[in-house]
Amino acid sequence: LIALLKQQKNIDARGIELSQKGVSLAVSKGIAVVQGDADADLFHYPDKGFDFVVLSQTIQATRRPEIVLRELLRIGRHAIVSFPNFGFWRMRAHLLLKGEMPVTEDLPYTWYDSPNIHFCTIRDFFDLCAQADARIDKFVALGGGRRPLPDSWPLAVKNVIGEQAVFLLSQKDGD
């Protein structure tokens, strides 16, 4: 996501990545990345030091999602958070019909070796945002082929049909 934003919007982008392999891959693509842990290292960054902070496909793998979300909004004026929707109908059907956790293109790990420790639906993330005093400025559910689902569709439908979710957030108090 950072590479896409850098390419299309010509932004000054920097990242934090847990794995050394991920750091090496990002650096090879010209993205400034340091190795770090969102659960432990965000407190090092200054208040409102960034216009936008991006947490892409990671919140479900953090130990303390609410604290991480609050830290994102402390260090950035806005946060962009994306994650796989565990409420997606195919995942529900797989669990119901096969009785086992699904392994998909977006979630390529078995349950016992997955970095995902908090299985989150789109509806769950709305609740987390309320708990963390995060204002949802924009929300997009992505369906097949990463196409945005229509804004007019109800949240309940997006929670079942959306494979991924992307949120643009800011602090409720406007800080």
Whereabouts are the PLM-identified features?
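Class I SAM-dependent methyltransferase SAM/SAH-binding core
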Residues: 1-41
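Catalytic cores of nucleotide-enabled group-transfer and carboxylate-activating enzymes in metabolic
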Residues: 9, 72-75
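Structural signature of beta-strand start/N-cap positions in the alpha/beta core
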Residues: 12, 49-51
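Short, hinge-like loop/turn segments at secondary-structure boundaries
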Residues: 31-34, 51-54, 96-100, 155-156
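Short conserved loop adjoining the S-adenosyl-L-methionine
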Residues: 41-47, 63
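Alpha-helix C-terminal capping/helix-to-coil transition sites in glycosyltransferase folds
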Residues: 48-49, 75
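A short SAM/SAH-binding and catalytic strip from SAM-dependent methyltransferases
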Residues: 51-64, 83
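S-adenosyl-L-methionine-dependent methyltransferase catalytic module, highlighting the catalytic core
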Residues: 67-71, 78-174
